[in-house]
Amino acid sequence: MNWPFFRAAVVLFIFLVVLEVNSDFRIQVRDYNTKNGTIKWHSLRRQKREWIKFAAACREGEDNSKRNPIAKIHSDCAANQQVTYRISGVGIDQPPYGIFVINQKTGEINITSIVDREVTPFFIIYCRALNSLGQDLEKPLELRVRVLDINDNPPVFSMSTFVGEIEENSNANTLVMVLNATDADEPNNLNSKIAFKIIRQEPSDSPMFIINRYTGEIRTMNNFLDREQYGQYSLAVRGSDRDGGADGMSAECECNIKILDVNDNIPYMELPTQSISIEENSLNSNLLQIRVIDLDEEFSANWMAVIFFISGNEGNWFEIEMNERTNVGTLKVVKPLDFEAMNNLQLSLGVRNKAEFHQSIMSQYKLTATAISVTVLNVVEGSVFRPGSKTFVVNSNMGQNYKIGEYVAWDLDANRPSTTVRYVMGRNPTDLLAIDSKTAIITLRNKVTMEQYKILGGKYQGTILSIDDALQRTCTGTIVINLENGGWKTERPNVNGSTTSAYGLTSGGVTTNGYTTGGGVGTVTFAVGTNGYGVGTGVYQPLRDNVHFGPAGIGLLIMGFLVLGLVPFLLMCCDCGGAPGGGAAFEPVPECSDGAIHSWAVEGAQADPGVLANSAVPCIPVTNANVIEYVDNSGVYTNEYGAREMQDLGGGERTTGFELTDGVKMSGGPEICQEYPGTLRRNSMRECREGGLNMNFMESYFCQKAYAYADEDEGRPSNDCLLIYDIEGAGSPAGSVGCCSFIGEDLDDSFLDTLGPKFKKLADISLGKDVEPFPDSDPSWPPKSTEPVCPPQGTEPTGGGHPPISPRFGTTTVISENTYPSGPGVQHPTPIPDPLGYGNVTVTESYTSSGTLKPSVHIHDNRHASNVVVTERVVGPISGADLQGMLEMPDLRDGSNVIVTERVIAPSSSLPTTLTIPDPRQSSNVVVTERVIQPTSGIVGNLSMHPELSNTHNVIVTERVVSGSGITGSSSLLGSAGGGSGGGIGLGSLGGGGGLSSSLGGAATIGHLRGSAEHHFSNTLGSASPTTTRSRITKYSTVQYTK
């Protein structure tokens, strides 16, 4: 590099800069004066114009008007024209308004009010110079006015109370929390500089915390914080501005510091040594309570203790369970102690916490042992089997009474075999073993057969009971016999595919038919070889699995999938729900049809349980002809259908693998169906019962029931008597037709009147009435006389010993009559429907073949009805006198009283020509006399009503009084008295001079007879003598009458 040239260039540059800064731009102009001929040179110098005067600062909170003008602006344009000055901005034309004003001519700016720096730290005034036309002569100028700060705001903490926490035993100078405070005065100024100071500490034993003067950080002063001494500290902190000066402003806050617990206390047991005692061979769940003391925070992991064994519990006889709520340990005995083996134990216990110890005391912890002395008390012990289970081996060469070994109980106190016990077999499958009660020698009862081998699955497991009668104690030992290597031969196949064992017992197949072998698998596969004579070699060899999936199986699978593809096509061709007459279709099922199949799956009524109980296939006891018994009387069933469980009452052990059922609660052998002799099924016996019914017995039973019903139906006579039907809906109000009015005559049910007596029973069943049995044609029926015995007057009769029938309300009852003639048949006239419905009606029906009708029948009934008097269907022989004018009807002043006379048939003798009935104006008593039949001779009787029956609502009907010859009877009917005027109605003898009269207190006559020209009056009445005498009292429900 050429340093001389570089230095020369730098010097020249510096010289030009200095020259430019310190020199003025001047222009000299020559002025020639023509008067005196002289020349003057004027020097013109360019100067920067003075446009503003810098504004003075304003102090907040003071009157700054003494400093006016705080600024002055001026434009050079004012030299040659008029200039107007204007200002704008915050404090002028923006809030706060009117703080600054300007003199438009001189440009002086004045302040007019007190300012607040915290509200407006500074003002920006926009100045403009305008000409007379309002145009800017200069570019607008910004004038800044600064507001000086004063210390008028104290420090403010962000929270009134600060909360912090720190662990005990923390190191010195550990940060606890940081306080935050602010000052609204000017930042980075002494007025806003805050200094912090701790002015108070609670508890005030010794200062534990320090605070940073400038940052507000609170730290620990030392490492002596101890939660067990003080769990919380409270500090009062002051913050002062002006760096804590005396002239500064200050504020205070609270600081709460929680001391957290650490595991710095070693737990220890309340008692250093303890002594206890316990009897041998006993267990105790609360042998000793051990309390642990720990000074750490309760219910925390630092406080919860764990007690452990240091020594003395090598046999695991004891356990310790801790209570976390009380920190108390419970010493338990979980394994019996033996006095003969040890009579004293020394336990050494240690304790620690669940949580690890704090590092501050880790080096100080030393394990301290607590001694527990346990004394074992001696007791008189019984005998026990040692060992608890014993195994023997039995082969096919061992025969009956073969001694396979002995299993004796051991006397623990004497340490020798017990001599005071007796032995019995407990659980003994297939009754295989026997034991000597004194010597405990175990022998075989019989030679082990192949059936027993299969039942046991190759392994026998039973129990032996050792009973000490003196001490009343029993112990149990288990016997296990391995039969796998006993040398039993396998089965060989027969010609028909079944297998025959070496002992000649045939079983259907190659399975064990319901009995598991060892692990519970019920199927055993045999490999059967043949010798030169075609007989199996008897080698027991499981077959190897050589089954594989060949082409034929694949073809069958493909064919199955193809058949499934035809299902949619078949469904399309199926005529499901077709139109009527178009082939098979869905049959409509009526609603509310219960059908004849009942819940017990037998058509018709439920059969007698005692009869059907014999139809099930009985289970036969187990004998040697089919299966050897394998359960003794100590076995108890514990399940139903399909479980494989059996319990032993003596030893409390349970053995699985037996297929037992709860069908008959049998103990001593499995259930065997007679249809499967000699076999035992693998599954539950429920399939055997449900699938193996004795069909011959069931067929015979149902045939006998069908024949009995047929014979009973044929033995009943034809029912050809006059039937009375109540037309349903009679007396309905006129407006009750409703929406069914358009049906018209389609619902005419008059054809039911000609159906005959065959449909009476169907009608009774439909109405829910009790169907009366038809009389048998056998003259011996009924077996005894049922002639009614009428009670004396003033009492209420009972019907046939049956309890009284409670009245029902809100229903309509149809009264049907049945009379069985002994002579020629009766012509059936067309019945006339009653214009009135029956309500609150009591009907007394009587049948007799000879003798005189008992005159005294008294009925007390409190039912109510309308004011109706009905004399209805009085029937006598055809030779009666003219009935015209017989009855007279009074003037019905009360419209509610209705008198109806209907179907009166005259007998051979004349009836009285008049029927006098007084005016029943205030009476509501209704008396109906109905169908009194007398073929030849007269009936002398009367129907009287007590005169006290006025204003009552009792309806009494005397119905179907049938007489063969010379019946004289009366029926006296009494109702509850109601008060008012009333009377009685007396019924005289009808037919031979009988008549009907009444004295109810008035006089009125009926001079005409309704329906005298009915066609059935001329019909000849045959003998209507029934075959028996019956009496019935029926109470009917309430029906409204048409008045």
Swiss-Prot record:
- Biological classification of the source: Eukaryota, Metazoa, Chordata, Craniata, Vertebrata
Q: Which residues lie on this side of the membrane: Cytoplasmic?
A: 573-1043
Q: Which Pfam families match?
A: CADH_Y-type_LIR, Cadherin
Which segments sit on the Extracellular face? 50-551
**Per the record's keyword annotation, is RNA-binding included, yes or no?**
no
User: Domain remarks in the entry?
Assistant: Three calcium ions are usually bound at the interface of each cadherin domain and rigidify the connections, imparting a strong curvature to the full-length ectodomain.
- Output the GO biological process annotations, alphabetical, semicolon-separated: cell-cell adhesion; homophilic cell adhesion via plasma membrane adhesion molecules
Identify the InterPro entries for this entry: Cadherin-domain_protein, Cadherin-like_dom, Cadherin-like_sf, Cadherin_CS, Cadherin_Y-type_LIR, Catenin-bd_sf, Desmosomal_cadherin
Instruction: Give UniProt keywords alphabetically.
Output: Calcium, Cell adhesion, Cell junction, Cell membrane, Cleavage on pair of basic residues, Cytoplasm, Glycoprotein, Membrane, Metal-binding, Nucleus, Repeat, Signal, Transmembrane, Transmembrane helix
Assembly, in brief, is: Binds to JUP/plakoglobin. Interacts with PKP2. Interacts with DSC3; there is evidence to suggest that the interaction promotes cell-cell adhesion of keratinocytes.
Major location category of this protein: membrane
- UniProt membrane topology term: Single-pass type I membrane protein
Biological role stated in the UniProt entry: Component of intercellular desmosome junctions. Involved in the interaction of plaque proteins and intermediate filaments mediating cell-cell adhesion.
Tell me the tissue specificity. Expressed in the epidermis. Expressed in the muzzle epithelium.
Subcellular location(s): the record lists: Cell membrane; Cell junction, Desmosome; Cytoplasm; Nucleus
Q: Which residues of this chain are annotated as glycosylation sites?
A: 110, 180, 496
Propeptide positions, renumbered to this chain?
24-49
One Gene Ontology cellular component term attached to this UniProt record is: desmosome
Q: Which residues form the signal peptide?
A: 1-23
| Molecular function per GO | calcium ion binding; gamma-catenin binding
Give TM segment ranges: 552-572
What residue spans do the Desmoglein repeat repeats cover?
819-845, 846-875, 876-905, 906-933, 934-962
- Which residue intervals make up region (Disordered)? 770-807
Q: Which domain of life is it from?
A: Eukaryota
Residues covered by the Cadherin domain = 50-158, 159-270, 271-385, 386-498
Which protein, by its recorded name, is this? Desmoglein-1
